């Protein structure tokens, strides 16, 4: 790979910033360019996903996107550009739509192993954990579909190309903003089956078993197919059979396993071998490897049946028979009546003003929108946040998260079963009162704020988020999950898909932690037909004129809320461009455990010492959250897959 150091640069915001000097080379099979990348200006030396080495603030990278299924072409040919964990390209740099300044230097040694690159597109963009799924979404956009059509296509494609979390056997949430000003939120979260009981996961001594996280009894009634079909019906423009074609093709003809999926399968192989799905993902006990052509004929048959017969083909036909038979085989309790009864729900969006911007977020049964809104409202009480990276900054941000999570765990649940004080939790007056409880000199123990909670230590985090925008200015933020990585582990034989273990997101034992360490009270107890509380936080940020500025969301259990919020803070308060906003080190506080979790190397040693002296417990973790985002810039859109993991951003 050819690369030379940048010969010159200019000072920008007190830091050395690189000048973009693209040289585009086009032919019928590729689009490639040389560029000086400003995205590496605050990152110390590391190897990025393209193999280019960042040296301080000076980088020259040579990238080339070869044609994959006819997707790459020159900008003048309206071709697709993109970036992914396996390489990518950027047609040209866009100027941010809002003023940005260089953030303070990140701690020395801070680096992100995946080293994702951003993609720029003039008209439309899709970002997800799977390059193949993102490209499937762009195929629909280029065929004349809108953002909802493309989001539905992406959702089905993820069931093929990112099966640890992308799914048809789970559920999720979708936030939609149309260019005409309409906003909508769709709840297609799983529900507890009719035979579910309050204490179904407790043993004879009243202790919590692992049956809520593993095996047939952990499965909630899936909502994914009903949700995707409902979104398409109300806001899409293309038929279901058309938007499902890319997913069906990927399942039937196969696709080459990329490094992200290869690692995912390898990481889950031991668990997968316990179940029927191991025959597909680990034939003869050996995990499918990166570079393998991977076909899923049973899943292709299932998807084709849904494309031909609509969502009811999943909930009433042979697929439903196969699902129920598999669950009965292992002691599960979902019936065909449970499946036939499932209905996704349109809910009133959580819309709040933050600074000069508007946030459109998900209401309960997701806790994400309300909890994030409460935290941001608290932080808005500071006319200006402390400098990013300082002791004061991490103290106030973590303290806001702590208070919002206390309310999340004590007050939020399925609104069809529990009266949720939405007006209180999202009010500026309430936020002002909570801000007054933050001591700027010391940490406040959670027990002082809420004595009722008790903690236990269980952790985990696997979900997937995707963001889509189209040429008309419509936008979709969708988060979907099986809960744990590879869900319950239960494989529907003959149908080719994995089922969720979402029942663990109920408070199976109120006051005790679930798999994610979240402590919840009676309002989230198990009840038949009830949706379990979730942390998923798909969010769309609108500018002062009501136009889409940012489409964002994340995976990562409870860190979804704090990770999504921090990317928003980095853009709106810390004035970072979207790539820096994604790269910036993150922290997390969920009330219990009563500590700040921080990314290894992400906080300067002196700041860590100061936070400990203030009374904060400090716990390090290799990486926090898996965010995928799109931001409007002058002349188009920039899409950034999570730099801590892998994914793909593609557009045209």
Q: What are the residue ranges of the model-derived segments?
A:
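Cysteine-centered motifs
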Residues: 25-26
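Extended C-terminal subregions enriched in glycine
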Residues: 530-531, 564-565, 573-622
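Bacterial N-terminal signal peptides that target proteins for export
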Residues: 19-20, 33-38, 42-61
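Internal maturation/activation junctions in enzymes
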Residues: 103-104, 382-482, 491-495, 502, ...
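Bacterial N-terminal signal peptides
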Residues: 58-70
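Active-site rim segments in enzyme catalytic domains, especially the processed small/beta chain
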Residues: 160-185, 333-335, 475-544, 574, ...
């Amino acid at each position: 790979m050819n690369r030379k150091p940048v010969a010159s640069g200019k000072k920008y915001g007190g830091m050395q910033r690189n000048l973009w000097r693209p040289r585009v080379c086009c032919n019928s099979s590729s689009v490639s360019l040389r560029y000086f990348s400003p995205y590496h200006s605050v990152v110390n030396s590391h190897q990025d996903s393209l193999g280019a080495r960042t040296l301080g603030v000076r980088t020259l990278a040579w990238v080339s996107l070869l044609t994959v299924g006819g997707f790459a072409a020159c900008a003048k040919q309206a071709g697709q550009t993109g970036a992914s964990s396996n390489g990518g390209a950027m047609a040209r740099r866009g100027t941010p739509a809002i003023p940005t300044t260089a953030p303070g230097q990140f701690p020395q040694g801070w680096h992100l192993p995946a080293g994702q690159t951003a993609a720029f597109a003039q008209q439309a963009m899709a970002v997800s954990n799977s390059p193949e799924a993102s490209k499937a979404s762009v195929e629909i956009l280029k065929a004349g579909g809108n953002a909802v059509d493309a989001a539905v296509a992406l959702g089905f494609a993820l069931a093929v190309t990112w099966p640890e979390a992308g799914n048809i056997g789970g559920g999720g949430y979708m936030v939609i903003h149309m260019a005409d000003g309409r906003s909508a939120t769709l709840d297609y979260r799983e529900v507890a089956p009719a035979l579910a009981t309050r204490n179904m996961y407790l043993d004879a001594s009243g202790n919590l078993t692992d049956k809520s996280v593993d095996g047939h009894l952990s499965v909630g009634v899936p909502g994914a197919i009903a949700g995707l079909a409902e979104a398409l019906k109300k806001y899409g423009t293309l038929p279901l059979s058309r938007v499902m074609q890319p997913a069906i093709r990927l399942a039937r003809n196969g696709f080459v396993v990329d490094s992200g999926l290869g690692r995912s399968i390898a990481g889950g192989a031991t668990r997968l071998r316990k179940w029927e799905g191991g025959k597909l993902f680990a034939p003869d006990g050996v995990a499918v490897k990166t570079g393998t052509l991977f076909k899923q004929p049973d899943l292709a048959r299932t998807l084709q049946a849904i494309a031909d017969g609509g969502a009811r083909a999943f909930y009433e036909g042979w697929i439903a028979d196969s699902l129920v038979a598999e669950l009965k085989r292992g002691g599960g309790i979902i019936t065909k009546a449970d499946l036939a009864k499932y209905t996704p729900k349109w809910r009133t969006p959580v819309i709040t003003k933050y600074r000069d911007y508007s946030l459109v977020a998900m209401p309960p049964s997701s806790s994400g929108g309300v909890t994030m809104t409460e935290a941001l409202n608290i932080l808005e009480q500071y006319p200006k946040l402390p400098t990013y990276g300082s002791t004061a900054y991490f103290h106030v941000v973590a303290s806001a998260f702590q208070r919002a999570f206390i309310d999340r765990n004590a007050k939020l649940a399925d609104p069809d079963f529990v009266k949720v004080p939405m007006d209180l939790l999202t009010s500026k007056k309430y936020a002002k009162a909570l801000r007054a409880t933050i001591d700027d000199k010391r940490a406040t123990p959670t027990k002082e704020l809420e004595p009722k909670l008790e903690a236990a230590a269980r952790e985990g985090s696997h979900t997937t988020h995707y963001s889509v925008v189209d040429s008309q200015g419509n936008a979709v933020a969708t988060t979907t999950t099986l809960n744990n990585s590879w869900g319950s582990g239960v494989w529907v034989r003959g149908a080719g898909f994995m089922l969720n273990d979402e029942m663990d997101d109920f408070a199976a034992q109120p006051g005790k932690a679930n798999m994610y360490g979240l402590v919840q009270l009676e309002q989230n107890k198990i009840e038949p037909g009830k949706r379990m509380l979730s942390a998923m936080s798909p969010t769309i940020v609108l500018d002062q004129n009501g136009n889409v500025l940012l489409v964002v969301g994340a995976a990562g259990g409870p860190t979804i809320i704090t990770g999504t919020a921090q990317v928003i803070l980095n853009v709106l308060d810390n004035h970072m461009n979207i790539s820096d906003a994604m790269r910036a080190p993150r922290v997390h506080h969920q009330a219990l455990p009563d500590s700040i979790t921080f990314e290894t190397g992400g906080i300067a040693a002196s700041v860590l010492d100061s936070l400990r002296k203030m009374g904060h417990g400090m716990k390090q973790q290799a990486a926090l959250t898996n965010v995928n985002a799109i931001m409007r810039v002058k002349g188009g859109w920039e899409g950034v897959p999570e730099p801590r993991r892998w994914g793909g951003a593609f557009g045209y």
